[in-house]
Design a protein with these regions (language model features):
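The canonical Cys-X-X-Cys-His
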Residues: 35-43, 94
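Electrostatic cytochrome c docking/interface patches
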Residues: 16-34, 50-52, 63, 68, ...
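Detector for the c-type heme attachment site
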Residues: 40-47, 99-100
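Bacterial N-terminal signal peptides that target proteins for export
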Residues: 1-9
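Residues in well-ordered alpha-helical elements
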Residues: 28, 60, 89-92
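Bacterial N-terminal signal peptides
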Residues: 8-17
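Gly/Gly-Pro-rich "capping" loops immediately C-terminal to redox-active cysteine motifs
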Residues: 44-75, 80-84
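C-terminal capping alpha-helices of c-type cytochrome domains
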Residues: 71, 84-104
């Protein structure tokens, strides 16, 4: 019984040890994707111009807006093309990233 508990504890610790680097790597990839948005929407989604800020944007709203750009339902100058370059997972990751950024 003790051997099973020790094995389970060791396995649990190993899972937790490997989970943190994966999350950090995912965040790094998302920041890389978000850097593409910075050209128009500002660093970390905080726009200084007339273009909408993405910082603090609701996750669901971000995903819906990107879907509307993809489908052509929402008018755009460039976003209808850019939105097609991201997978659904990448859009969800960007939505979470920008939602976590403080509004200006």
């Amino acid at each position: 019984m003790r051997k099973q508990i020790a094995t389970a504890a060791l396995l649990g610790a190993a899972i937790l040890a490997f989970q943190a680097p994966v999350q950090a790597q995912d965040l790094s990839k998302t920041r890389y994707l978000a850097a593409n948005c910075a050209n128009c929407h500002g660093t970390n989604g905080q726009s200084v111009g007339e273009i909408a800020s993405l910082a603090g944007y609701d996750k669901g709203g971000f995903i819906s807006t990107m879907a509307e750009f993809r489908s052509g339902k929402r008018p755009a100058t460039i976003m209808h093309q850019l939105s097609k370059g991201y997978s659904d997972q990448q859009i969800a990751d960007l939505a979470a990233y920008f939602a976590a950024q403080p509004k200006k």
